[in-house]
Amino acid sequence: MTETAKLADVILPGRSYAEKEGTFSNTERRVQRVRKAVEIEGDTKPDTWIFTEIMRRMGYPQPHLTPAQIMDEIASVTPSFAGISHERLDSEEVNGQGLQWPCTSKDHPGTPIMHVGKFARGLGYFRPAAYTPSMELPDEEYPL
C-alpha cells in the first residue's frame, strides 16, 4: 500500500493504465484506442465499474457498460465525436492512428487542424489564474 493510501478513509480498486481498455484523447484532439496490456492479480475494477457502483450505492442505478458502449453514447450526444467508435478506431481505414475531433460523421476523416489563419471567434483569450493559497498544508497527521 502506498504512503498516500495509508492515509485514505476509502480505497477504490482502480486499475493502472496498462490494465485498462477504452479510449483516450491527447492534446491534439486525437482519440485513440487503449488496449489492456497486462493482467494483474487482485481485485481491481475498471473505472466505469467504480463509478456505476458508487451511483448504485447512492440510489441511482446505472447499467455497467463496455468501453465500446460508452464511446457510442458519447458519439450519440456529442456532435464533434459523432463519427468516432471503437469499431472505426480499430479499422484498417484508421490504421491505429486515431481520429481527431471534430469528426462529425462515420465517413468524416477527422480534423487535423482546427483553426487555419485565425480563431473562429477572433483572438484567443489569456486569463491567468489568481494565486490561491492551500486551505490545508501538510502536518504530522497528514504529511503528504
Model-derived regions: residue spans:
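Non-catalytic alpha/beta scaffold blocks inside enzyme catalytic domains
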Residues: 1-85
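Long, low-complexity segments enriched in small/aliphatic residues
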Residues: 67-144
